[in-house]
UniProtKB/Swiss-Prot annotation:
Ligand binding (ATP): G50, I51, S52, G53, G54, V55, D56, S57, T167, K196, T218
Top-level lineage group: Bacteria
Enzyme Commission code(s) on record: 6.3.1.5
Function description: Catalyzes the ATP-dependent amidation of deamido-NAD to form NAD. Uses ammonia as a nitrogen source.
Species this chain originates from: Pseudomonas entomophila (strain L48)
Coiled coil region boundaries: none
Subunit structure and binding partners: Homodimer.
Residues the record lists as binding Mg(2+): D56, E172
Protein name: NH(3)-dependent NAD(+) synthetase
Keywords: ATP-binding, Ligase, Magnesium, Metal-binding, NAD, Nucleotide-binding
A GO BP annotation: NAD biosynthetic process
Protein family: Belongs to the NAD synthetase family.
Residues annotated to bind deamido-NAD(+): R147, K180, D187, H267, K268
Keyword Cell wall biogenesis/degradation: no
Length: 275
Protein backbone atom coordinates (compact mmCIF):
# COMPACT_ATOMS: atom_id res chain seq x y z
CA UNK A 1 0.00 0.00 0.00
CA UNK A 2 1.39 3.37 -0.98
CA UNK A 3 1.35 6.16 1.59
CA UNK A 4 -1.33 8.14 -0.25
CA UNK A 5 -3.60 5.08 -0.38
CA UNK A 6 -3.24 4.62 3.36
CA UNK A 7 -3.88 8.31 3.97
CA UNK A 8 -7.08 8.28 1.92
CA UNK A 9 -8.31 4.98 3.36
CA UNK A 10 -7.82 6.27 6.90
CA UNK A 11 -9.55 9.57 6.11
CA UNK A 12 -12.58 7.70 4.76
CA UNK A 13 -12.46 5.09 7.57
CA UNK A 14 -12.41 2.29 5.01
CA UNK A 15 -13.32 -1.08 6.50
CA UNK A 16 -11.10 -4.09 5.76
CA UNK A 17 -12.35 -6.79 3.38
CA UNK A 18 -14.83 -9.26 4.85
CA UNK A 19 -12.99 -12.45 5.79
CA UNK A 20 -15.79 -14.95 5.45
CA UNK A 21 -19.51 -15.09 6.22
CA UNK A 22 -19.07 -14.55 9.96
CA UNK A 23 -17.27 -11.24 9.42
CA UNK A 24 -20.01 -10.13 7.04
CA UNK A 25 -22.74 -11.01 9.53
CA UNK A 26 -20.86 -9.19 12.28
CA UNK A 27 -20.58 -6.05 10.15
CA UNK A 28 -24.29 -6.17 9.30
CA UNK A 29 -25.13 -6.46 13.00
CA UNK A 30 -22.78 -3.58 13.84
CA UNK A 31 -24.39 -1.30 11.29
CA UNK A 32 -27.92 -2.24 12.33
CA UNK A 33 -26.94 -1.44 15.92
CA UNK A 34 -25.53 1.89 14.72
CA UNK A 35 -28.87 2.80 13.12
CA UNK A 36 -30.77 1.82 16.25
CA UNK A 37 -28.39 3.87 18.36
CA UNK A 38 -28.88 6.94 16.18
CA UNK A 39 -32.65 6.75 16.61
CA UNK A 40 -32.43 6.15 20.34
CA UNK A 41 -29.97 8.98 20.87
CA UNK A 42 -32.23 11.35 18.93
CA UNK A 43 -35.28 10.02 20.80
CA UNK A 44 -37.05 9.52 17.49
CA UNK A 45 -38.80 6.52 15.96
CA UNK A 46 -38.87 7.10 12.19
CA UNK A 47 -36.34 6.60 9.41
CA UNK A 48 -36.71 8.03 5.90
CA UNK A 49 -34.78 6.96 2.80
CA UNK A 50 -35.14 7.59 -0.91
CA UNK A 51 -35.16 4.44 -3.05
CA UNK A 52 -33.60 4.85 -6.49
CA UNK A 53 -33.50 1.28 -7.77
CA UNK A 54 -29.75 0.95 -7.22
CA UNK A 55 -27.89 -1.32 -4.84
CA UNK A 56 -26.78 1.47 -2.48
CA UNK A 57 -30.27 2.62 -1.48
CA UNK A 58 -31.42 -1.01 -1.49
CA UNK A 59 -28.71 -2.00 0.98
CA UNK A 60 -29.22 1.00 3.24
CA UNK A 61 -32.96 0.32 3.26
CA UNK A 62 -32.51 -3.34 4.17
CA UNK A 63 -30.34 -2.34 7.11
CA UNK A 64 -32.84 0.34 8.14
CA UNK A 65 -35.88 -1.94 8.00
CA UNK A 66 -34.07 -4.58 10.03
CA UNK A 67 -33.16 -1.96 12.63
CA UNK A 68 -36.79 -0.85 12.86
CA UNK A 69 -38.03 -4.44 13.08
CA UNK A 70 -35.61 -5.13 15.93
CA UNK A 71 -36.60 -1.97 17.79
CA UNK A 72 -40.28 -2.88 17.55
CA UNK A 73 -39.54 -6.39 18.77
CA UNK A 74 -37.31 -5.25 21.62
CA UNK A 75 -39.59 -2.47 22.87
CA UNK A 76 -43.06 -3.65 21.89
CA UNK A 77 -43.58 -0.17 20.45
CA UNK A 78 -45.36 -0.24 17.09
CA UNK A 79 -44.53 3.44 16.59
CA UNK A 80 -41.15 2.64 15.06
CA UNK A 81 -41.46 3.07 11.28
CA UNK A 82 -39.30 2.97 8.17
CA UNK A 83 -40.52 5.11 5.26
CA UNK A 84 -39.17 4.32 1.80
CA UNK A 85 -39.60 7.20 -0.64
CA UNK A 86 -39.76 7.03 -4.41
CA UNK A 87 -38.57 10.31 -5.91
CA UNK A 88 -38.90 10.04 -9.69
CA UNK A 89 -38.41 12.87 -12.12
CA UNK A 90 -41.61 12.22 -14.09
CA UNK A 91 -41.29 8.60 -15.24
CA UNK A 92 -38.02 6.90 -14.29
CA UNK A 93 -36.62 4.72 -17.08
CA UNK A 94 -35.69 1.94 -14.63
CA UNK A 95 -38.79 2.21 -12.47
CA UNK A 96 -39.12 -1.58 -12.63
CA UNK A 97 -35.85 -1.87 -10.68
CA UNK A 98 -37.08 0.57 -8.05
CA UNK A 99 -40.26 -1.44 -7.64
CA UNK A 100 -38.23 -4.65 -7.44
CA UNK A 101 -36.18 -3.08 -4.64
CA UNK A 102 -39.34 -2.17 -2.75
CA UNK A 103 -40.53 -5.76 -3.00
CA UNK A 104 -37.29 -6.94 -1.40
CA UNK A 105 -37.19 -4.22 1.27
CA UNK A 106 -40.80 -4.60 2.44
CA UNK A 107 -40.80 -1.12 3.96
CA UNK A 108 -43.41 -0.18 6.54
CA UNK A 109 -44.54 2.68 4.32
CA UNK A 110 -43.85 3.76 0.74
CA UNK A 111 -44.35 7.37 -0.31
CA UNK A 112 -43.94 8.80 -3.82
CA UNK A 113 -43.02 12.39 -4.66
CA UNK A 114 -42.62 13.47 -8.30
CA UNK A 115 -39.84 16.06 -8.15
CA UNK A 116 -40.33 17.29 -11.74
CA UNK A 117 -42.67 20.25 -11.00
CA UNK A 118 -40.38 21.66 -8.31
CA UNK A 119 -37.21 21.15 -10.36
CA UNK A 120 -38.69 22.77 -13.45
CA UNK A 121 -40.09 25.69 -11.49
CA UNK A 122 -36.74 26.49 -9.88
CA UNK A 123 -34.83 26.12 -13.15
CA UNK A 124 -37.31 28.35 -14.97
CA UNK A 125 -36.96 31.10 -12.36
CA UNK A 126 -33.15 31.04 -12.27
CA UNK A 127 -31.82 33.82 -14.47
CA UNK A 128 -28.25 32.51 -14.35
CA UNK A 129 -29.26 29.39 -16.26
CA UNK A 130 -30.63 31.31 -19.21
CA UNK A 131 -28.23 31.37 -22.13
CA UNK A 132 -26.05 28.62 -20.70
CA UNK A 133 -24.86 25.77 -22.90
CA UNK A 134 -27.18 22.74 -23.05
CA UNK A 135 -24.60 20.56 -21.29
CA UNK A 136 -24.06 23.07 -18.48
CA UNK A 137 -27.78 23.59 -17.93
CA UNK A 138 -28.33 19.82 -17.93
CA UNK A 139 -25.59 19.33 -15.34
CA UNK A 140 -26.85 22.10 -13.06
CA UNK A 141 -30.44 20.88 -13.31
CA UNK A 142 -29.19 17.39 -12.45
CA UNK A 143 -27.89 18.79 -9.18
CA UNK A 144 -31.21 20.54 -8.61
CA UNK A 145 -32.85 17.11 -8.91
CA UNK A 146 -30.57 15.66 -6.25
CA UNK A 147 -31.17 18.57 -3.89
CA UNK A 148 -34.93 18.50 -4.47
CA UNK A 149 -34.97 14.82 -3.58
CA UNK A 150 -33.27 15.60 -0.29
CA UNK A 151 -35.70 18.46 0.39
CA UNK A 152 -38.57 16.02 -0.11
CA UNK A 153 -37.03 13.47 2.25
CA UNK A 154 -36.43 16.08 4.94
CA UNK A 155 -39.99 17.34 4.48
CA UNK A 156 -41.30 13.86 5.20
CA UNK A 157 -38.86 13.40 8.09
CA UNK A 158 -39.93 16.74 9.54
CA UNK A 159 -43.59 15.85 9.30
CA UNK A 160 -43.03 12.45 10.89
CA UNK A 161 -40.30 13.35 13.40
CA UNK A 162 -37.69 11.18 11.76
CA UNK A 163 -34.10 10.95 10.56
CA UNK A 164 -32.97 10.87 6.93
CA UNK A 165 -30.64 8.09 5.86
CA UNK A 166 -27.88 8.67 3.31
CA UNK A 167 -26.34 6.10 0.97
CA UNK A 168 -22.79 7.40 0.63
CA UNK A 169 -19.99 4.86 0.96
CA UNK A 170 -16.21 4.99 0.62
CA UNK A 171 -16.11 4.15 -3.09
CA UNK A 172 -18.33 7.15 -3.87
CA UNK A 173 -16.82 9.41 -1.23
CA UNK A 174 -13.29 9.04 -2.59
CA UNK A 175 -14.51 10.22 -6.00
CA UNK A 176 -16.69 13.00 -4.58
CA UNK A 177 -19.54 11.36 -6.46
CA UNK A 178 -22.45 13.06 -4.75
CA UNK A 179 -24.21 16.40 -4.87
CA UNK A 180 -23.42 18.92 -2.16
CA UNK A 181 -26.49 19.27 0.05
CA UNK A 182 -28.24 16.77 -2.22
CA UNK A 183 -27.64 13.04 -1.85
CA UNK A 184 -24.64 14.03 0.28
CA UNK A 185 -26.96 15.46 2.94
CA UNK A 186 -28.35 13.15 5.60
CA UNK A 187 -28.58 12.51 9.33
CA UNK A 188 -26.84 9.14 9.30
CA UNK A 189 -24.81 7.23 6.70
CA UNK A 190 -24.91 3.51 7.54
CA UNK A 191 -22.83 2.51 4.49
CA UNK A 192 -19.94 4.82 5.38
CA UNK A 193 -16.51 3.20 5.12
CA UNK A 194 -17.64 0.36 2.88
CA UNK A 195 -16.34 -0.19 -0.63
CA UNK A 196 -18.72 -1.06 -3.44
CA UNK A 197 -18.26 -4.82 -3.35
CA UNK A 198 -18.97 -4.79 0.39
CA UNK A 199 -22.23 -2.92 -0.20
CA UNK A 200 -23.15 -5.60 -2.73
CA UNK A 201 -22.15 -8.37 -0.33
CA UNK A 202 -24.44 -6.99 2.37
CA UNK A 203 -27.36 -6.75 -0.07
CA UNK A 204 -26.68 -10.32 -1.16
CA UNK A 205 -26.65 -11.49 2.47
CA UNK A 206 -30.22 -10.20 2.81
CA UNK A 207 -31.27 -12.33 -0.17
CA UNK A 208 -31.50 -9.53 -2.73
CA UNK A 209 -31.60 -10.85 -6.31
CA UNK A 210 -28.42 -10.69 -8.38
CA UNK A 211 -30.15 -8.50 -10.97
CA UNK A 212 -30.30 -5.75 -8.34
CA UNK A 213 -27.02 -6.53 -6.58
CA UNK A 214 -25.00 -6.39 -9.80
CA UNK A 215 -27.01 -3.68 -11.55
CA UNK A 216 -24.77 -1.15 -13.32
CA UNK A 217 -24.59 1.88 -10.98
CA UNK A 218 -25.85 5.17 -12.40
CA UNK A 219 -26.71 8.54 -10.86
CA UNK A 220 -29.18 9.18 -13.70
CA UNK A 221 -29.38 12.93 -13.10
CA UNK A 222 -28.71 14.31 -16.58
CA UNK A 223 -31.36 14.29 -19.31
CA UNK A 224 -28.78 14.48 -22.12
CA UNK A 225 -27.13 11.27 -20.92
CA UNK A 226 -29.85 9.23 -19.22
CA UNK A 227 -28.62 6.13 -17.44
CA UNK A 228 -24.96 7.11 -17.80
CA UNK A 229 -22.92 4.60 -15.76
CA UNK A 230 -21.03 5.95 -12.75
CA UNK A 231 -17.85 4.36 -14.06
CA UNK A 232 -18.08 6.37 -17.27
CA UNK A 233 -18.05 9.52 -15.15
CA UNK A 234 -15.26 8.25 -12.91
CA UNK A 235 -12.90 7.14 -15.65
CA UNK A 236 -12.14 4.09 -13.52
CA UNK A 237 -14.15 1.04 -12.46
CA UNK A 238 -15.53 0.35 -9.00
CA UNK A 239 -13.33 -2.74 -8.95
CA UNK A 240 -10.29 -0.47 -9.32
CA UNK A 241 -11.62 1.98 -6.72
CA UNK A 242 -12.26 -0.84 -4.24
CA UNK A 243 -8.79 -2.26 -4.82
CA UNK A 244 -7.21 1.17 -4.31
CA UNK A 245 -9.07 1.75 -1.05
CA UNK A 246 -8.03 -1.67 0.26
CA UNK A 247 -4.39 -0.94 -0.48
CA UNK A 248 -4.13 -3.29 -3.43
CA UNK A 249 -2.17 -2.47 -6.60
CA UNK A 250 -3.98 -0.77 -9.48
CA UNK A 251 -2.74 0.55 -12.79
CA UNK A 252 -0.83 3.81 -12.69
CA UNK A 253 -3.57 5.46 -14.75
CA UNK A 254 -6.29 4.37 -12.31
CA UNK A 255 -4.12 5.38 -9.35
CA UNK A 256 -3.55 8.86 -10.75
CA UNK A 257 -7.25 9.36 -11.59
CA UNK A 258 -8.42 8.33 -8.12
CA UNK A 259 -5.87 10.46 -6.27
CA UNK A 260 -6.46 13.51 -8.49
CA UNK A 261 -10.25 13.19 -8.17
CA UNK A 262 -10.02 12.77 -4.40
CA UNK A 263 -7.97 15.93 -4.07
CA UNK A 264 -10.13 17.91 -6.49
CA UNK A 265 -13.31 17.00 -4.62
CA UNK A 266 -12.00 17.55 -1.10
CA UNK A 267 -14.23 20.63 -0.80
CA UNK A 268 -17.27 18.33 -0.98
CA UNK A 269 -16.16 16.27 2.01
CA UNK A 270 -15.22 19.18 4.30
CA UNK A 271 -18.07 21.64 4.63
CA UNK A 272 -18.30 24.50 5.13
CA UNK A 273 -15.09 26.45 4.68
CA UNK A 274 -14.43 28.69 7.67
CA UNK A 275 -11.71 31.22 8.61
Amino acid sequence: MQAVQQEIAQALKVQPPFEGAAALEQEVARRVAFIKGCLNNARLKTLVLGISGGVDSLTAALLAQRAINELRSETGDAGYRFIAVRLPYQVQHDEHDAQACLEVIKADEVHTVDIAPAVRALAAETEALKGGSPSLVDFVVGNIKARTRMVAQYTIAGARAGLVIGTDHAAEAVMGFFTKFGDGACDLAPLSGLVKNQVRAIARSFGAPESLVEKVPTADLEDLEPGKPDEASHGVTYQQIDAFLHGQPVSQEAFDIIVATYRKTQHKRELPFAP
